[in-house]
Amino acid sequence: MDIRASIEDTRKGFEESFASEEFYNRQTQDAEHLERILAFINVRDGMRILDLGCGSGYLSFPIAEKNLGCEVIGLDIVSDTIGVNRSKAQEAGLSNLSFVSYDGIDFPFEVGTFDLVVTRYALHHFPDIKHSIGEVSRVLKAGGTLFISDPCPNDCDTERFVDDYMRLKKDGHIKFYTKTEWQDICSECGLQLTDSFESKIRFPKKKDTAYGYKEVLKNHDKAVIESYDLVETDTELHITERVNNILFIKDEA
């Protein structure tokens, strides 16, 4: 895999997504899920928090607004959106919130910078996931925590229909990971699972970006496809995906 080419595909794909703000919000926003995350991550005064793959700041802004005694930094590869986020944070008077762009590979922070790293609906786009989780571990303090929220394949989907489906839009999708896969990857980087919950997302996709949709359906078992409650309208496709929400803690030094 050409890692830099994959990152560029993701950057371009999300530039397009962020430009279609209303549809992007339909894909990603879920008030109930957000409130559950905010209660689950246990933010405390004085924390330094990194929102990895922050996008338009869906986690960054409410975390900063609810926890003025914390420093929150959003990190993303889409520099234009980072600029928009900075302006919004300034307009909102959130002096504890800042945004940083990076190359999608190495985090621009020192060892042990953060108490908490959060990431939502982003890691399935990271082409070298072991390196990225290693970077998370590097910038976390000993005893710090990582919160991952990302969709996962259904148990019956051993051939990964869902990944083929998500790759229909050329935005750098790599794969959805199972909870066990996350445990294995994170454990190798000194991060141990401490708590989790599962949620769901009803994900819309524009048909005019779903290149090869019919071919993907032909290549997978009908029962597996039906397990995702896939529905087709005149202009859109809708799929229900399970979401892993997992909390890890970094080993003490």
Where on the chain are the PLM-derived regions?
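Conserved class I S-adenosyl-L-methionine
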Residues: M1-V43, Y58-P62, T81-V84, F147-K169, K207-A210
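Class I SAM-dependent methyltransferase SAM/SAH-binding core
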Residues: L50-L52, S56-D106
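A short acidic, Gly/Pro-enriched loop at the edge of an enzyme's catalytic core
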Residues: I105-L116
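A short SAM/SAH-binding and catalytic strip from SAM-dependent methyltransferases
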Residues: L116-P127
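A short glycine-rich, Lys/Arg-flanked "PGG" loop and its adjoining helix->strand segment in the class I
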Residues: K130-A142
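Short alpha-helix
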Residues: K175-C189
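Conserved Class I S-adenosyl-L-methionine
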Residues: T194-A253
